Amino acid sequence: MKAGALEIRVRRMNVSDIDRVFMIAWSRTQAPKWTKAAYLSALKKDAMPRRIALVVEDSGEGHAPLVVDWKAPDFVETERSTTAEGEAKSGLVVGFAIASLVPPQAELETIVIAAAEQRHGIGRQLMTAMAEELSAAAVSEALLEVRASNERALGCYRSMGWHEAGMRPRYYAEPEEDAVLMSLALG
């Protein structure tokens, strides 16, 4: 699948992706600051609520290094993930999304694309893949929160059929900000 000039692939997240996912999240100022343990728990098949975790990877060529503004707990810099067998994967993880499921609803808990990879349609491809996964899991409505000041994300979500469903006052901290609650009908 192509996103702009990039060759990308969306797939399920696995344990070997966690260091890179963690690094991407901590390189983005407004991304949720989960611990590695939280990302690992999202991969557990028996976790409640059940989660779907996806990553998007590309060819891995010509990437700008990630810049982390502060020292993240458990931070380990890695360039490429490996498979369970220890072989290098063909692509470099450049973004991820995690949704929690309580059918018939799901909540998109986080979607993060590395800064240097934004504006190439990668987030749109990842959101489309997540919507397909959620539909296959008997979800008929997806919800998400987005910072009220994040006009680029709001515009992208609206263009993909998401609708504003309300506001969550002072939902975000550092800096404190309202969240726009959005919903998407699936299926």
Language model features with spans:
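Positions that flank functional sites
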Residues: 40, 149, 172
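Exposed loop/turn and edge beta-strand positions of beta-sandwich/beta-sheet ligand-binding modules
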Residues: 4-7, 50, 102, 107, ...
